Amino acid sequence: MTNKEKSNEEDIILNYLLNKHNFTYVSVLGKGGFGSVYSINVNENNFAYKIVRLHKKKGKIEEFNKAIKSIEKEFNYAKLLRGKYCIRTLSIFKDEDNKNPKIIAYSAVMENALYSDLKYFIYYFYKGNLLHLNNYKKYFKYISNLNMTTIRFFAYQIIQSLDFLENHNLCHCDFKPENFLISLGFILKISDFSLLKVVEKNKKVKLTSSTWNIKAPEYYTSTKEIKSEDAIKVDIYGFGLILYYMLTYKHLLNPEDKEKLSNKEISSEEKYEYLNKKLLDKSEEIKNFENVDQGLKNLIIECINPEISKRPNVENLLENDWVNENIDEINQVYDINDHEEIKLFIEFQKTSNKNNNKVKNRKRKKNLFFKKKYKEIQN
């Protein structure tokens, strides 16, 4: 499929689903290989709308069914998770207009991060272009540049999300700056549960593929399996990489490392040894960073330890002296009452119910046009 055909297909699916549910398109928030996220309005309320499309291909029915299970697991868990540090999923949909569709579209209405993701935020700080960050100005008393206080401000919240995941027996497996969205009250909220793992006591956790530059060494072991009690330490490794990125505006691994770690001709054992050495070398480099709190340097080095058993656990992070320094003052900045999120949920339910009535009563000409186009790409 050419890029033009792919774009045309995306537009047809988007218009069909927006019209079907009576949502109003606002803008594109992000696009990936299998789906996209849009900003939409439901009456006067703004939400994020994620659409994932799956294609049924000849001879690959098993892969297709596996992908369906994966998407349904992601969406269902996202809807169940209710925490201060998780993006809230309000409603999920599965398009089933055709009995034997070539394409299945899953979509979810989610809380929209009001500002951006953490990677975007860091980008504009390092570029010095704060004009793009006007929404953050009320926080500039504490966040005037990406200094130790700023990094501590974010580190504290990411640790809270780690605590939330562990308490729910979950491992996110994709900890990176772009998966942390900045929402109401300047709260960092974790998103994208596509690689989520459920951790069962005394059962090993099998790791699935992740972004190459955030894969922990245990991804390169022969079995790719870890003990249940160590599962959260995969995310703690990712936390260490996020701290390093905030401090340097660089990923710990570079394109040269990608050539080595992505090379199919190199064995997993060789990749494992290569990454271990790289992490030990980087740890020595971090020790020599100037104008950086010793506590932060120690924290990064501990989190990126090649040996999973030697990384700190969540309890260690919650009690970390550097993280908790002056935390009461920082806490005042992003404190938010739970009623704001409850209000968001109620507003969506109200507007969703109103829309259901509108769909039944409105003129159907436009709806039939998009439905016809949608059926064309199914054949």
Which residues does each PLM region occupy?
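Conserved short submotifs of the Hanks-type protein kinase catalytic core
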Residues: 101-117
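Protein kinase glycine-rich loop
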Residues: 26-32, 37
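Activation segment signature within eukaryotic-like protein kinase domains
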Residues: 154-155
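Terminal C-lobe "cap" of eukaryotic-type protein kinase domains
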Residues: 306-330
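Conserved HxN/HPN-centered segment at the entrance to the catalytic loop
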Residues: 82-92
